[in-house]
């Protein structure tokens, strides 16, 4: 009734290997004619187009098992239900990847605009932030560890960040906090909310500067002295906690280095 073709002929037409065709058969996607005398399998154009259809579904992101199942559906409605669900998954992936691209461009802009100790007034990004340590010591409760572990799952959208509390600066307390942050524009991807340990810092007018730090030197708010001098000269007052964004880190030899962008709330 139908012309038949060998597995080699079919593989050549499709640009795939004979083993791939055998794999589709094992998954129940095609049912070639089996010659019991020779033990050879022969394929028709139905098999050709069934494989093409299967590869289309695989191209939409369905797994091989999901592809096998959809090809066994008996109604268009059943097929559409599967495709509707896959459409939602593709849409979610597109949204995620668009934000990933935006994050990459944001990061590159921070790197390209890095000017050490150059002072300007800018609006800070809104960020969510959680502490990892006080100064250089990890001292977290079990609940803090759990929330921190969850926060670290948001890579690559998160960044390391130092925090200098306003009250510490006013009382000349050199302790600071280090932690992890995420910009508000990306927090919605993960439905991040404020908690006892996750704190939100809204966008606000800040004195902006950049500086580099290194592991051989203890970090203190004293690195911000150029900013404090600028504030005195321009009648600006500190109006909140100071936080930094780590633009990048590197380790050329035995020492660690950070590049910080610093946001100093002023009024």
Regions found by a protein language model. Name each.
Residues 81, 98, 102-267:
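A solvent-exposed interaction/effector surface
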Residues 1-60, 234-239:
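Basic helix-turn-helix/winged-helix DNA-binding cores
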Residues 11-20, 25-32, 72-89, 147-162:
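An N-terminal domain-start capping segment
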Residues 35-36, 55, 60, 67-121:
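Short, charged amphipathic alpha-helical surface segments
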Residues 33-37, 58-68, 256-267:
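Histidine- and aromatic-rich ligand-binding microenvironments
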Residues 42-44, 76, 250:
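Short Asp/Glu-rich motifs
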Residues 22, 35, 68, 163, ...:
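Short loop/turn and capping residues at structural boundaries
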């Amino acid at each position: 009734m139908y012309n038949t073709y060998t597995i080699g002929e079919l593989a050549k037409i499709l640009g795939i290997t004979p083993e791939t065709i055998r794999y589709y058969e094992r998954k129940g996607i095609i049912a070639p004619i089996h010659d019991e005398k020779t033990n050879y399998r022969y394929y028709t154009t139905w098999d050709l187009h069934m494989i093409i259809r299967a590869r289309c579904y695989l191209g939409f992101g369905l797994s091989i098992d999901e592809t096998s199942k959809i090809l066994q559906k008996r109604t268009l409605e059943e097929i559409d239900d599967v495709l509707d669900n896959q459409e939602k998954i593709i849409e979610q992936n597109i949204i995620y990847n668009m934000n990933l691209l935006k994050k990459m461009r944001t990061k590159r802009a921070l790197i390209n605009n890095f000017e050490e100790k150059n002072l300007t007034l800018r609006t800070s990004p809104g960020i969510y932030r959680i502490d990892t340590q006080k100064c250089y010591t990890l001292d977290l409760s079990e609940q803090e560890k759990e929330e921190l572990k969850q926060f670290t799952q948001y890579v690559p959208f998160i960044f390391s960040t130092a925090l200098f509390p306003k009250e510490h600066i006013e009382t000349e307390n050199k302790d600071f906090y280090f932690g992890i942050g995420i910009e508000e524009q990306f927090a919605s991807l993960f439905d991040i909310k404020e908690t006892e340990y996750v704190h939100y810092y809204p966008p606000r007018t800040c004195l902006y500067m950049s500086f580099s730090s290194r592991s051989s030197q203890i970090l203190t708010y004293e690195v911000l002295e150029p900013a404090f001098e600028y504030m005195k000269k321009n009648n600006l007052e500190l109006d909140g906690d100071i936080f930094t964004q780590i633009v990048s880190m590197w380790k050329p030899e035995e020492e660690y280095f950070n590049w910080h962008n610093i946001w100093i709330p002023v009024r």
